[in-house]
Amino acid sequence: NIAGDNFYQTEDDFRAATAPLYNKVWFDFNDKFYYGLGDGRGFNLCATTSNYIYPFADLTETGLTGPLVSAWGSLYNIVQQTNKIINGIKGNSSNSEEVKNPYIAEARFMRGVAYSYLAMLWGNVIINEDTDELVANPIVNTSPVSDVYEFAMRDLEFAAKYLPEVSSAAGRVNKYSAFGMLSRVYLTYAGYSSNPNSATRNQDYLDLAKKAALKVIENRNFELMTDYADLFMIDKNNNSETLFALQWVSNGTYGECNTIQDYFACESAITGNDRAWGGYVFAQPDVIWEYEKGDKRRQPTWMAYGDHYPEIQKANGGYTCEKKASGTVSGIYCKKYVCGSSKDNAKITSGSTPINTYMLRLAEVYLIYAEAILGNNPSTDDADAMEYFNKVRKRAGLEPQNSITYEDIRRERRLELCLEGQYWYDLVRRAYYKQQEVL
């Protein structure tokens, strides 16, 4: 009989134990919350009837709002699963620390990411490293948000030290995934203090964010994809820009597959079935107005009238977004994570696409690096900051800038990472030290 006390015997066991950390435990986070909160509450998305978006977009969610409850459960599922893995591998005496540490680091990476989300979303939460202990003594005090961030950073620092230089398999994280995630968490924590209107950030953590981002930038195994649209093609999963992505199973069962297309696709002509519930999910005008003329990111992100997509309805020469019948609600629809039907790609089935969900991309690390250099200054023309900020703009087909402000970085992050569940957290990060501005 396989049990927790006899499973963790070989490196193959360690590898098998960490595999579900890339999909199953994240499913309830990914299914509706990833974009519902990150983009709905961030005012990128609006929805008149979709109860997984409009409570966030309308700022009417409660502690019982479905996706919020699901996300809480998902994040603590990650914590408890990683605890079992970490303690199970540690308890193995037949393998060396050299063999065990990379798998412990993989689990601690996931736990660190989960706690970084818990800190930004709920603030004071329970920190737990032993699932059995929590079951035996379930009444536990929450820890201050500063301690939660510190815990997340310690996990990610361990991961950066012990994860392999190169991923052990496609889609698995490596030490640069950890450095990239550390750069985000350091940048966030730099602004946190007891005064939400301090208007300044901790320079030590800004420096740490810069150093962690530079570790990733200097690794030549990572580079921006040439074509922004390619980032969201199934056959481009685990590309040169991916630092951490959820890995969904082709033709997978519920809980192991990516369901986002169901909620984003605007009509069944795209999916080839009735699972196309995005006909009333639209871009907020506010985000569309932010795009500069010629920005190549708009069409791969949002579907507007007349936009053509050759990868959808391939047999018919592609799909063109057209206006709906008179009298129906229309708008600019979601395109990211919308991949088509099984006729377009045999890996797609009803309610299931295997496209990865991005959790961290190289482009974001470039923008983190630029923001860390900007720091507390009103603007910067620092050569390094401008080089990496403009790399992101160049791919988007936009003219380079000679200097940047926080507002430039805010807008660039919003458009680069739109529908990737990040913009609300950008606003929270800013509100840690400039709350009135964000309000």
Task: Pin down the residues of each PLM region.
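Short coil/turn linking the two alpha-helices of tandem helical-hairpin repeats
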Residues: 119-121, 126, 167, 188-197, ...
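Conserved, well-structured interaction surfaces
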Residues: 10-11, 15-29, 51-122, 137-150, ...
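C-terminal substrate/ligand-recognition segments
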Residues: 300-392
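An aromatic- and glycine-enriched ligand-binding surface/loop that stacks and positions planar moieties
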Residues: 1-52, 86, 125, 149, ...
